[in-house]
Amino acid sequence: MQTDVFENKVKEIPETEGIKYAGSKLKILPYIMRIVSDLEINTVLDGFSGSTRVSQTFAKLGYDVISNDVAFWSETFAKAYLLNTENPAKYQEIIDHLNGLKGYEGWFSQHYGGVENNGVKYPFQLKNTMKLDAIRDEIDRMNLTEIEKSVALASLILAMDSVDSTLGHYVSYLAEWSPRSHKDLHLRLPKLFVNNGKNKVVRDDIFNTVKEHKVDFAYFDPPYGSNNEKMPPSRVRYDSYYHIWKSVILNDKPKVFGKANRREDSRDEYSASVFEEFRKDENGSFIAMQAIRKLIKETNARYILLSYSSGGRATREELFDILNESGKLIRAEEINYKKNVMGGMRWTNEWINSDNKNFEYLFMIEKS
């Protein structure tokens, strides 16, 4: 359990797990749940679920959750954690079988497995990609149910994440092997829990998802683009950071490019999100902010909680206008990661330390 002290009260947040993830909401989960605790809600949409920690938390607390993301690996994690209705121990035999396999050099070893002192940077040591090759091919050969396969794949990705030699993403790799990369790949049973059977997992564009579902509460944490005006058009997109997990899920052995051996479909023209768009439209408004405006307007929920990073594109005035167009802004909070404190936003001032990457903002809207 995560503990969180606020106004002399201690809140317990259910334990969750996930990979190292640039968009992880692990640190702000207590703040999210504190805000939500005052609401009378049953159904929740986690619109950009990513590593699924937010979805896991709501599900463990008894809410009916719709977990949505466009990433295949996020869908797999969501299925493993949110759709399981069995005793988790039933999956241990699968994990044990996969751990017992002998590794061999296959597609993953060819592209992502490195050895000591050869002068080339790789995300994993060869001994572990060999095990990955064997395990991933075996998963496809086994007669697994959808949930069993999701559990096996989630376990595999968690294991790979624990022996990588990266900073947490896969667009560049460390010059020297990380200490954890020397460990042997070993799968363990994910920390599953028994669900109520009412959760739903969706892999779709968020605009399609909000049109098809009505919920009491929606949480949105889009992959915002940088507010750096000097950011070049060729910058790496969010989806590209985790291209390797897509390859693990699909096992499709795609064509790759560049020094990091990224998937061809992780290029900007294939994988870019409108929420990451750093350009302005013909009216001088950031395209990403217009996407937020559209999302809030089209979401069928009584309450919407929007996360926004201090590194994003919005100006104070623009975001304030967007939030109030489709409802009433009833709460605005600023979180200082370094100080681990939350305080009300001062709308009469400029963004507080707006160039500080350690700030996160939470905006609660009640739709009209």
In which residue ranges do the predicted regions lie?
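Class I S-adenosyl-L-methionine
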Residues: E317, K328-S368
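Conserved Class I SAM-dependent methyltransferase catalytic core
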Residues: R267-G327
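Conserved SAM/SAH-binding loop
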Residues: R203-N208
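Conserved proline-anchored active-site loop of SAM-dependent methyltransferases
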Residues: I32, V44-F58, S67-F72, H213-R235, ...
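S-adenosyl-L-methionine
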Residues: M1-F48, R53-K60, N84
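Class I S-adenosyl-L-methionine-dependent methyltransferase module
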Residues: D64, A71, E75-F193, K230-G284, ...
